Regions:
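AAA+ ATPase "lid" subdomain C-terminal helix
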Residues: 180-207
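Walker A/P-loop NTP-binding motif of AAA+ ATPase domains
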Residues: 1-181, 185, 197
Length: 207
């Protein structure tokens, strides 16, 4: 984060300011949440883009939307643009691919090359890094790449504490026991369990 918030200091030492990073890993592990918290800590404006936000994905016009997105981010800089499920937005350019998709990827590459000079940082998240166009992962683009694993036992315990924090509970909750019983569960699974339990309790109380 320091390299983004103290750009001039790092440039003085000849450090190349990164333009973006890729967060990849299994579904439900909090990649978008991490992106938002990263932005919050840096004090940047946060812009979340999902595949459905680019309605021109299979018709002409998608590249113009990408260009306008980066212009808007620059006008409100410092900004973080988070492309959620980036594999669906910027897939590999292969023979026979829709020309509008190829044009959109080309526009993205042109825009991200200039991000650090415009007060913009790009974060891309995906469950399928192998489907992303290779050019996006080269130096000067999404060069920072981090694997976000499923939560371990201690992380699951902390997630239960987080989601149960403001819930009404008639008994003391054994967070460690819950963690032990939810091996291989991801963050979204734990959130669902807590919400389901709260809903069931509320329904019983109504009756």
């Amino acid at each position: 984060i320091d390299v983004l918030t103290k750009v001039e200091h790092f440039k003085k030492y000849g450090v190349t300011i990164p333009n973006g990073m890729l967060l990849y890993g299994p579904p439900g592990c909090g990649k978008s949440y991490i992106s938002e918290k990263f932005c919050e800590e840096a004090g940047f404006n946060f812009i979340l883009i999902k595949p459905s936000d680019l309605s021109s994905i299979y018709v002409s016009g998608g590249e113009e939307k990408i260009g306008q997105l980066f212009t808007d981010a620059e006008n409100n800089s410092p900004s973080v643009i988070c492309f959620d499920e980036v594999d669906a937005i910027m897939p590999k350019r292969t023979e026979g691919i829709n020309q509008s998709v190829s044009a959109r990827v080309n526009e993205f590459l042109a825009q991200i090359n200039k991000c650090s000079d415009r007060g913009i940082f790009v974060i891309a998240t995906t469950n399928k890094p192998d489907l992303i166009d290779d050019a996006m992962l080269r130096s000067g683009r999404l060069e920072l790449q981090f694997y976000i694993p499923p939560p371990d036992e201690n992380a699951r315990k902390e997630l239960f504490k987080l989601h149960l924090k403001n819930r009404y509970c008639e008994i003391d909750i054994n967070h460690e026991k819950l963690s032990n019983k939810t091996k291989n569960y991801v963050a979204s699974d734990i959130e669902f369990i807590v919400n389901k339990a709260a809903h069931k309790s509320a329904m019983l109380d109504v009756r």
